[in-house]
Design a protein with these regions (language model features):
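Cleavable N-terminal export/targeting peptides
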Residues: 1-33
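Outer-membrane beta-barrel translocator domains and adjoining extracellular loop/strand segments
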Residues: 54-62, 97-105, 135-142, 178-185, ...
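Outer membrane beta-barrel
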Residues: 77-173, 287-310
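Transmembrane beta-strands of outer-membrane beta-barrel proteins
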Residues: 41-49, 77, 85-91, 124-128, ...
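Outer-membrane beta-barrel architecture
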Residues: 75-77, 112-115, 156-158, 187-193, ...
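Exposed, low-structure sequence patches enriched in small/polar residues
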Residues: 47, 60-62, 69, 107, ...
Length: 345
């Protein structure tokens, strides 16, 4: 099939300073104190991927009802100093590009949020993306070229109560195409930089990070039968946990991440009641002119979705990184690989 692609991307930024009118003496005093006037900034981008399909009967391309196919995104964000950010995204995919699932067809404002920041706290209400650690139990993200957008609509709180400590708590419903699943997600994450508490590590210029996270989902009861008279007793609440440790010193970087979840029968695992787990190990060293990387991963039954009966690429709560051999530009098709959520080693 002959295809003509047209990709257009535009980015704009508008900033304005707003400062109350002050007497000359007060204005000079404010400047001498080093205080900056509040700044209102408007940023945005427009991306439109357009395809003009052409029929070619000689090779049997078939035909399209639409003469123009497009995936168009418009992002806008309004920031007031460092305290408030309000934004949203308009998407037009009424006639999506080939390769996207049919449920992507539609248009509207699919993403909007408001984020407030004050001292050591940050609160987001609306849609947001989040990742705990390496994403083994929770990673929501957008990859529009692959048709992935599993954002959460709800609330998220981030705190920095102590030096080197970061806490996260969130809850909401996950996006599925142009709707949101009925199941409810919640979770928490804690990361502690131990080098900021242990003087010996700080003196040796070493970094030691400890992370813990919890992700849970509640999904309503559903009638699923494995035979005409055998109804499954499905768990309504599913929990997943993660613990990770990372050490850095000079050119060395060592990381270990282990995650597990309780029994979670779903279409992905053929409604098995087995528990799931994944272990991720990574070690690297680099210096001028030399580097090496060694990684290993073992996973079993770690497909984790907010809709147990879902298929395709939507509604995934977690993310399992893909490990494969490095490719060259000339041989990109060698060693093709896709993550196997049911298990791999």
């Amino acid at each position: 099939m002959k295809k003509i692609y047209l990709i257009m991307t535009a980015l704009f930024i508008y900033a304005a300073q707003a400062q109350e009118a002050l007497p000359v003496s007060d204005s000079l005093q404010t400047q001498s104190a080093g205080k900056k006037p509040s700044i209102v900034r408007l940023t945005g981008s427009i991306q439109s991927d357009i395809l003009f399909p052409e029929e070619d009967n000689a090779i049997g391309t078939g035909s399209y009802k639409d003469k123009v196919l497009t995936n168009t995104y418009v992002d806008l964000a309004l920031s007031v100093a460092d305290y408030l950010t309000v934004g949203g995204r308009f998407e037009y995919l009424d006639h999506p590009l080939p390769g996207f699932e049919k449920d992507f067809a539609g248009w509207g404002v699919s993403y909007f949020y408001a984020t407030g920041r004050y001292r050591n706290a940050e609160l987001t209400v609306g849609d947001f993306y989040e990742q705990f650690g390496n994403g083994l139990t929770l990673r929501t993200y957008e990859e529009r070229s692959l048709g992935i957008d599993n954002s959460i609509r709800g609330g998220r709180l981030i705190l920095h109560p102590l030096k080197g400590l970061r806490l996260k708590a969130l809850g909401g419903k996950q996006r599925r195409y142009w709707d949101h699943n009925d199941s409810f997600l919640w979770g928490g994450d804690a990361e502690l930089n131990l080098d900021q508490w242990l003087r010996k590590l700080e003196e040796q210029d070493a970094r030691l990070l400890l992370g813990l996270s919890y992700t849970g989902k509640h999904e309503k009861e559903e009638d699923i039968y494995i035979a005409s008279d055998k109804k499954l007793n499905l768990p309504l609440n599913i929990a997943a946990f993660d613990v990770r440790l990372q050490f850095q010193k000079n050119g060395y970087n060592l990381m270990a991440d282990y995650a597990w979840k309780i029994n979670d029968p779903s279409f992905d695992n053929q409604y098995s009641y087995d528990r799931g787990s994944v272990l991720l190990l990574s070690g690297s060293y680099s210096r001028k002119g030399m580097s090496f990387l060694l990684q290993a991963k073992r996973s079993e039954n770690m497909a984790f979705r907010s809709l147990r009966s879902m298929t395709g690429i939507s509604s995934f709560i977690n993310y399992l990184p893909a490990f494969t051999m490095q490719q060259t530009y000339a041989l990109p098709a060698l060693y093709p690989y896709a993550t196997q959520p049911l298990g791999e080693w």
